[in-house]
Amino acid sequence: MSSSSPILLMFIFSIWMLISYSESTDYLVGDSENSWKFPLPTRHALTRWASNYQFIVGDTITFQYNNKTESVHEVEEEDYDRCGIRGEHVDHYDGNTMVVLKKTGIHHFISGKKRHCRLGLKLAVVVMVAPVLSSPPPPPSPPTPRSSTPIPHPPRRSLPSPPSPSPSPSPSPSPSPSPRSTPIPHPRKRSPASPSPSPSLSKSPSPSESPSLAPSPSDSVASLAPSSSPSDESPSPAPSPSSSGSKGGGAGHGFLEVSIAMMMFLIF
């Protein structure tokens, strides 16, 4: 496990360097060809140029110059300040020097000629660590569609139900006149006819005091015919004899009428 750790670290470092170099930028010193030369437009022209950019690990700066008159030396800060051209420096004389910035911090470059360095032909760049690649922000989610207002559908018209046929009032049967039953006369037992008392000759009896006489034959026939009410079925009483008939044989005439009435009753 311990032997694999250095390999893993080197692999991670290689990947990191590869990513850094893939995002590196190549800068031309002074933004023009043959800008590494003397005299400069101003003494601080290269310092002003470097302040316009932000350098990161993996970037490349290129020096273009005339290699017959100029050279490039990578020095420490002390030699940069005093323009010391002697020491352990990295010297370039090819006329098209490309320097890869491999570590963070301040990198110092001076001219191979001390006089030119003092007149401003020198450069210091600040190198920063490459920013960590952040995953791009997710694309904004599309706005949620607003819920469409439901279109109100017209209510379905219910078909009118056919009116239920109302039961037609059945014509009530008119009361038919019930046939009046003719009372069948039952024969009555023959009772001995008692002679009606003869009225007193001294005073004529009043209608309430005179005995009711048997009905006449015409009245008996009428009582047998159908009548409109039960009261009609009873035989009407015979008229009382007038006071004038009570004189001169009234008793015999009354007995005769009673006999005739009894005979008619038995016949019918």
From Swiss-Prot:
Positions of disulphide bridges: 83-117
Chief place of localization: membrane
CDD domains membership: Phytocyanin
Known glycosylation sites: 67
Keywords of this entry: Cell membrane, Disulfide bond, Glycoprotein, GPI-anchor, Lipoprotein, Membrane, Nodulation, Signal
Location of region: Disordered: 134-253
Biological role: May act as a carbohydrate transporter.
UniProt name for this protein: Early nodulin-20
Organism: Medicago truncatula (Barrel medic)
